[in-house]
């Protein structure tokens, strides 16, 4: 199977989710990850499970997950791969990261935990703090909607299709 076929036929393995494997969240601290690892490592340690290949493989996966999630630089790379939604395994992505990251400008940023929670009654986020320049916000957040041609005086708004295209909605 070629590299392209592997990507096209890729099925994400639940064991590739190191956070779920350790029973943690991506907001967990290194101390929390280490504590969860110790509990699971005791259960699956090869010395406690004589000759069980499955327990040994699970222990190796747990060890690998702990090593990656406790190292800040490796964890940042893992989180980038995880959020990208790209159809390849983490190890394969790591081998190609310089090439792959160049084309990941389109991936969505992590917006999991906002500082200001929106309850629907008032706007949340940076725009709720006061007037802001829409040119400084991302197009996907309603900013950068600068239209009109430079120097022509044409101030007609762009068509709906053009706006969606510019905001990566189509």
Curated annotation (Swiss-Prot):
Residue segments, region Disordered: 101-170
Composition skew (Low complexity), residue ranges: 121-134
Protein keywords: Chaperone
Domain J: 17-82
InterPro entries named in the record: DnaJ_domain (IPR001623), J_dom_sf (IPR036869), JDP1-like (IPR029827)
Skewed-composition ranges (Basic and acidic residues): 110-120
GO cellular component, one term: cytoplasm
Highest taxon listed in the record's lineage: Eukaryota
Database matches in PANTHER family: DNAJ HOMOLOG SUBFAMILY C MEMBER 12 (PTHR44500:SF1)
UniProt protein name: J domain-containing protein
Protein source organism: Bombyx mori
Upper lineage: Eukaryota, Metazoa, Ecdysozoa, Arthropoda, Hexapoda
């Amino acid at each position: 199977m070629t590299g392209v076929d592997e990507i096209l036929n890729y099925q994400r393995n639940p064991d590739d989710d190191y956070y779920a494997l350790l029973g943690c969240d991506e907001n967990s601290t290194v101390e929390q990850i280490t504590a969860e690892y110790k509990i699971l490592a005791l259960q699956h340690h090869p010395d406690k499970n004589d000759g069980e290949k499955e327990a040994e493989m699970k222990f190796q996966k747990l060890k690998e997950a702990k090593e990656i999630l406790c190292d800040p630089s490796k964890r940042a790379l893992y989180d980038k791969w995880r959020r990208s939604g790209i159809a390849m395994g983490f190890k394969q992505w790591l081998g190609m990261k310089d090439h792959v990251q160049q084309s990941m400008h389109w991936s969505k940023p992590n917006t999991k935990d906002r500082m200001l929670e929106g309850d629907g009654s008032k706007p949340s986020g940076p725009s709720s703090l006061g007037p802001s320049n829409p040119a400084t916000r991302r197009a996907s957040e309603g900013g950068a909607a600068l239209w009109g041609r430079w120097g022509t005086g044409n101030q007609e708004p762009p068509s709906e299709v053009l706006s969606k295209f510019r905001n990566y909605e189509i």
